[in-house]
């Protein structure tokens, strides 16, 4: 880490305005957060009460706290009882989807996002101790790289020129959750009665379909191999006239010439006869194509990064894919060879005349969903929240997305009204200055809105509250067991 001298700190390098940091506005970030919340307050009104003040307090807690952002600890920063916050997050009937829809409307209205945006589909798993949490089960946890007791969410992120955020999400419920034996557990944990089993790919398509019916503009849909290898999903995207660049595994089979798919002549007329590939040409795995002598690689500069420039080798060619007797589809096979020599593959429905630079751009968008996941978890506290019931999971998602959008909108506004001093880059000897990160902006908010310090009286009240709750819990357990208190 660089150590700065006193003389350096007095130079332009440490001048806040040179970095686009408006000192006066930093001091009023709390007011800015309040005004942001006011736009969403109606989303938290129910038929019986207005719970919007809980939303403001919870949002503030997510942004200002750094660890252990659970319901009880956030409640303490709000000056509320944990029970009231628990009720707001778990049982109150406000709609998380209504909040997410308003976020997307505001993202769509942002002039900076008029073109060049990408939707990115991904999943993220969190470890769970047992199946007592909605959606939990032994399933693949990508972070751990193994099958483990986990709760998995599918998420849709929006990315644009260095900005990224979740804009939608769905909780994946494994198929065994829909068995008759789990009916009571589904009801206990608030799973909607009309919820049916859906694969992660189907949940992903539901979100894409939902967002594409709104006004949010984007130029490409990207996804990892879990979703990209789905012929069904790629077909759905094409039918909806949405451009995609979908990562696929190295063993994905494609044809270099259009195959003939039909019912074999000798089987025509039979009721159960199914179409199949009749061509003599055999399919090839995409990793075989990358090694062909006719495959030409060219270096493409995709974008500037904080580490320099993303310049990798790319190659692309037209191929055909088919599955289960469906008519073949012509797609781009996009291949990227990174700096370590590893080759990554994607299929895209970009037009046949699309230049390699455009294909390379689409191939390199998926990394931003990892940035969105990191910000949601590390900065906003998604992985610290412990939603046991279905409504709590949806409510947590809505408030985490609100927090991320508030930070992103603040950065966008400052970037537009308080740009970097061009002399600063020259003084530092670089051609590009780093933008504010979500972590940077949150640090400023935490300074402008410091958490309340715990007094002796406050700590005493918390201890008594804890003891009272333990006493009531024991009383409840004894009542459940049918015991009676002894007279002494």
Per-range role (PLM):
Residues 111-112, 118, 442-488:
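Long, charge-rich low-complexity segments
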């Amino acid at each position: 880490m660089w150590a700065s001298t006193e003389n350096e700190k007095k130079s332009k390098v440490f001048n806040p305005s040179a970095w686009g940091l408006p000192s006066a506005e930093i001091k009023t970030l709390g007011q800015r957060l309040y005004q942001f919340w006011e736009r969403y307050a109606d989303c938290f009104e129910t038929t019986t009460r207005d719970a919007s003040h809980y939303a403001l307090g919870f949002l503030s807690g997510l942004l200002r706290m750094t660890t252990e952002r659970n319901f009880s600890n956030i409640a303490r920063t709000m000056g509320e009882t944990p029970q009231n916050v628990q009720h707001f997050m778990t049982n109150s009937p406000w709609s998380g989807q209504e909040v997410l829809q308003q976020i997307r409307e505001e993202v769509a209205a942002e002039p900076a996002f008029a073109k060049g945006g990408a939707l990115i589909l991904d999943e993220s798993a969190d470890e769970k101790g047992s199946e007592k949490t909605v959606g939990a089960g032994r399933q693949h946890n990508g972070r751990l790289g193994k099958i483990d007791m986990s709760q998995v969410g599918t998420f849709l992120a929006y990315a644009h020129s260095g900005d990224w955020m979740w804009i939608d999400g769905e909780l994946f419920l494994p198929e065994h959750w829909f068995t008759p034996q789990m009916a009571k557990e589904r009801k206990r944990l608030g799973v909607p009665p009309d919820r049916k089993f859906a694969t992660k790919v189907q949940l992903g398509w539901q979100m894409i379909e939902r967002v594409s019916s709104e006004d949010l503009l984007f130029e490409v849909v990207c996804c990892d191999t879990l979703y990209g290898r789905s012929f069904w999903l790629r077909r759905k995207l094409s039918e909806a006239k949405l451009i995609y660049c979908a990562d696929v595994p190295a063993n994905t089979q494609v044809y270099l010439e259009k195959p003939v798919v039909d019912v074999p002549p000798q089987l025509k007329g039979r009721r159960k006869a199914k179409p199949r590939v009749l061509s003599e040409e055999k399919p090839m795995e995409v990793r075989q194509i990358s090694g062909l002598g006719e495959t030409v690689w060219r270096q493409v500069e995709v974008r500037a990064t904080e580490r320099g420039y993303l310049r990798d080798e790319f190659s692309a060619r037209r191929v055909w894919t088919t599955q289960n007797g469906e008519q073949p589809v012509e797609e781009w096979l996009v291949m990227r060879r990174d700096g370590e020599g590893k080759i990554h593959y994607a299929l895209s429905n970009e037009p046949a005349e699309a230049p390699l630079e455009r294909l390379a751009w689409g191939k390199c968008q998926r990394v931003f969903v990892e940035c969105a996941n990191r910000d949601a978890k590390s900065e906003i506290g998604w992985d610290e929240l412990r939603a046991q019931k279905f409504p709590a999971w949806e409510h947590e998602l809505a408030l985490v997305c609100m927090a991320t959008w508030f930070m992103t909108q603040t950065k966008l506004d400052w970037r537009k009204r308080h740009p970097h001093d061009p002399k600063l880059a020259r003084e530092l000897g670089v051609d590009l200055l780093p933008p504010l990160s979500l972590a940077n902006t949150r640090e400023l908010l935490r300074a402008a809105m410091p958490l309340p310090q715990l007094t002796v009286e406050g700590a005493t009240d918390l201890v008594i509250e804890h003891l009272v709750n333990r006493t009531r819990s024991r009383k409840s357990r004894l009542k459940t067991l049918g015991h009676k208190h002894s007279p002494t």
